[in-house]
Amino acid sequence: MTKEEKNEKEALIEFFSSYRELFEFFCSNTTIHGAIRLVCSRRNRMKTAFWLVLFLVTFGLMYWQFGLLFGQYFSYPVSINLNVNSDKLPFPAVTVCTLNPYRYKAIQNDLQELDKETQRTLYELYKYNSTGVQGWIPNNQRVKRDRAGLPYLLELLPPGSETHRVSRSVIEEELQVKRREWNIGFKLCNETGGDCFYQTYTSGVDAIREWYRFHYINILARVPQEAAIDGEQLENFIFACRFNEESCTKANYSSFHHAIYGNCYTFNQNQSDQSNLWSSSMPGIKNGLTLVLRTEQHDYIPLLSSVAGARVLVHGHKEPAFMDDNGFNIPPGMETSIGMKKETINRLGGKYSDCSEDGSDVDVKNLFQSEYTEQVCVRSCFQAAMVARCGCGYAFYPLSPGDQYCDYNKHKSWGHCYYKLIIEFTSNKLGCFTKCRKPCLVSEYQLTAGYSKWPNRVSQDWVLHTLSRQYNLTDRNGIAKLNIYFEELNYKTILESPTINMAMLLSLLGSQWSLWFGSSVLSVVEMLELVIDFVIIGVMILLHRYYYKKANEGEETTVVPTPAPAFADLEQQVPHIPRGDLSQRQISVVADITPPPAYESLDLRSVGTLSSRSSSMRSNRSYYEENGGRRN
């Protein structure tokens, strides 16, 4: 095989020698519509220019659509899917509070002193006299509050007053003219006394309740957290309890004390044994929870709670009872029926929404013994900020081990710190609402309430007579009835799903590609091949230029040395011959003059003819010799 044949043999991988050759091959063989028009009409420059512009515009529009699709995909939109299911439903937890804060014996004296100071304040500011509060001083005496007693006394403040207290004479004169424009509040200062402000209110009722609440929280910090509610208090509050037409047992509820809403009892919250939780297989009042509650107001704190009845909250089994957020009150002397509808929301996590699966990815420590919720996180965040800023914790929220609740006997300026922290908290300067994300899976209960008078006139006598025999109760305003049930077993499930997933994105991209070029995935591969070949040709051109330039630089800088004459050594080796002996030793040179060969005989086409002539001559010669040199 000659060298030319070896070069003509097809190689395993071949590359184009120029961009023009690559472009012409691609346009002539690609499956992309319109590309062949760029080379088939090259003799007509106008057509070539038209198809080139059309091809580029179409290409640009397609990739503009691609950009829109990718932008929509990477914005991670979600679609809402609503499913309606019907099945046996687990009954939620129900917490009921008395709406009467209890007087602990450990702080009984402190609460009595607070009541006396409150009555002095009411008489001094509003000339109110009540004999229903323990320790009341007769109204015929001039009441002056002892500033050596409780700190942070209530004061009347003129409009615009922020840092000073107005004298009593000025107050009495001005109140006769513009009573509505005056505010009431109490002064709070930091530890050094250099930073002070008034916590003011336009309503005297709100101011007195908040002032009383502030001191009550301070006193409550001295109560041991292990203080339990005895069984006698439960029987005095809940007269009857039935679920699914069966009586409740002590295993069905747990109790705790709330500083504002009093003694609270939670039904159906047995986190240790989920098998004992209630469930409803039928809708209706008979298949729900029915409670008969006492709503009398005896031996409680009237200045802290001004509402009669009971506080109710429906929540999840593993969620804490935040009575001040989602709870509602039921009135005394009425039957309140609460119908429920369950709704489950399942959000997509990750890049699709800012939700948390279990709170482990949230930078806030959960202080509650419960599962993660947004409210749990927000309160834990506030408590952590208060402990860090004020040196003590809020009495309504749990603490980390080693921390203490706020008491102005130990923490003198905690009130000043607390009210300023509340302002930062509500304006999200603490960042709690930003840090705390919604849980991805949430179960909510949509509630509808109905009220009716209970007991009615016909049954009032015998119902109250029976209750008076058992519980010494004779007033219909001292009882209330509560029904909580499922209106229907159909529950909604709201699911989030990606609006554009990967399969849909590929489908949309393929649709756009087919719309603008009428091609397929193989056409995309051809485009990739074109790009790869383009890059390879560019690399080859650069390498060729590099090595060519390097070779030229080497030829210019290289100096070739002149070799020594080769005959020098020969002269030394040739022996000296005397001039007289030259005649005897002369060498005769005979030139052989031979004509050049006939190059016409080298013609390959005449090889066959010459060989045939030679063979003919040899045959004739042999014949002539055999016949003795005779010719025919």
UniProtKB/Swiss-Prot annotation:
Residue stretches of biased makeup (Low complexity): 612-622
Keywords: Cell membrane, Cell projection, Cilium, Cytoplasm, Cytoplasmic vesicle, Disulfide bond, Flagellum, Ion channel, Ion transport, Membrane, Sodium, Sodium channel, Sodium transport, Transmembrane, Transmembrane helix, Transport
UniProt biased composition (Basic and acidic residues): 623-632
Membrane protein topology class: Multi-pass membrane protein
Catalysed reaction equations from the record: Na(+)(in) = Na(+)(out)
Subcellular location: Apical cell membrane; Cell projection, Cilium; Cytoplasmic granule; Cytoplasm
Transmembrane segments: 50-70, 521-541
Ranges for region Disordered: 612-632
Pfam hit, one: ASC
Disulphide-bridged cysteine pairs: 97-264, 189-196, 241-248, 355-440, 377-417, 377-436, 381-432, 390-417, 390-440, 392-406
Domain of life assignment: Eukaryota
Residue numbers on the Cytoplasmic membrane side: 1-49, 542-632
InterPro entries recorded: ENaC, ENaC_chordates, ENaC_CS
One of the GO BP terms on file: multicellular organismal-level water homeostasis
Predominant subcellular localization, coarse grouping: membrane
Keyword Ion transport: yes
Recorded GO CC terms: acrosomal vesicle; apical plasma membrane; ciliary membrane; cytoplasm; motile cilium; plasma membrane; sodium channel complex
Key word Cell membrane present: yes
Protein activity control: Originally identified and characterized by its inhibition by the diuretic drug amiloride.
MF annotations from Gene Ontology: ligand-gated sodium channel activity
Extracellular topological domain residue ranges: 71-520
Protein family: Belongs to the amiloride-sensitive sodium channel (TC 1.A.6) family. SCNN1A subfamily.
Function, in words: This is one of the three pore-forming subunits of the heterotrimeric epithelial sodium channel (ENaC), a critical regulator of sodium balance and fluid homeostasis. ENaC operates in epithelial tissues, where it mediates the electrodiffusion of sodium ions from extracellular fluid through the apical membrane of cells, with water following osmotically. It plays a key role in maintaining sodium homeostasis through electrogenic sodium reabsorption in the kidneys.
Oligomer and partners: Heterotrimer; containing an alpha/SCNN1A, a beta/SCNN1B and a gamma/SCNN1G subunit. Interacts with shroom1.
Listed name of the protein: Epithelial sodium channel subunit alpha
Organism encoding this protein: Xenopus laevis (African clawed frog)
